[in-house]
Amino acid sequence: MENTEAKRNIKLIAFDLDGTTLHGFAELSERNRRAMEKANDAGILVVPATGRVRNFIPPCLTELPFIRYAITSNGGAVWDILENKVLCTDLIPTETALEVQKIFDDYELYVEYYVHGRGVTKRGNPDKARTVFGFPEEKYYFLTKDYTFTDNLSAYLKETHAEPEKINMMFIPESVRPEILARLQKLGGIELTFSNVDNIEINKKGCDKGTALYSLCKVLGIDPKNAMAAGDNGSDLGMLKAAGFAAVVGNGIEEAKAIADAVVAPCIEDGFAEAVERFALR
């Protein structure tokens, strides 16, 4: 990272979605969209870097003609959206995923497995979200996801030998969250991150958005020093450290702000656009 105000040679901008760029689940503001267009016109690649799996990235981004590459599943998979193919992966071994699921089987949880660009969950989970899982009304948009359903997640893993890009748990009851977290921390081979106070995200040990950014830069022949990252939360720390310039929105966590080269306006005030305008286009 750097702190100088000198002109930067930014060739790629990797940006988090939730809490950094999007307003709500799938709304891209006009200012943020224009900032992306201006960056593209300046020859800068604009790359979503998200904890979401490939098919959960909203059309407001995937339908933009200049969005070609995406870091997904917190670095578990990097996609060429135009060609609809995976460029590189860092997957959780099936055996490790089964160890994780063995813990989950002791609780009533909303669990998602991200496998080859799609979300997999237990049949009926979205229907129970409002009651059993207690989803708050403002989060109901999470229930509109296009899932692959299974009756038993352990059986699914055994039968398909799936190697997940990421495992995601949403809206974990506070009464059991510390216990679940403690049990997961005893397992080897996994990386735990948090994008909200009530979720847990699991990747392969050593996998994060930063390692994926390095991989994508290598594929494209770009020096990571010429990359800019924009984020807000714990799952963004890896790429904020990996990029040559790190911008954190005003609503970001203190740990992210502490490693930022610049702290910009909050997400809701289009801090992403501010970062692009001030530090990539000058």
Question: Residue spans of the language-model regions?
Answer:
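Active-site phosphate-binding/coordination module
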Residues: E30-P136
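Short active-site oxyanion
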Residues: G43-V47, F66-R68, K166, K225-N226, ...
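Conserved acidic, metal-coordinating active-site core of Asp-based
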Residues: I103, Y107-Y110, Y114-A230
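Mg2+-dependent phosphoryl-transfer enzymes with acidic/Ser/Thr/Gly-rich catalytic loops
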Residues: E2-L12, L28-S29, Q185, I200-R282
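Short, structured coil segments at secondary-structure junctions
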Residues: L64-F66, S73-N74, L82, L187-G188, ...
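Short, acidic loop-to-helix structural element flanking the phosphoryl-transfer center
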Residues: A26-G43, T89-T96, F149-S154, G206-K218, ...
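Active-site metal-binding loops of divalent metal-dependent hydrolases
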Residues: G19, R52, G75, G231-N233
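Asp-based phosphoryl-transfer active-site loop
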Residues: N9-F25, V100, L240
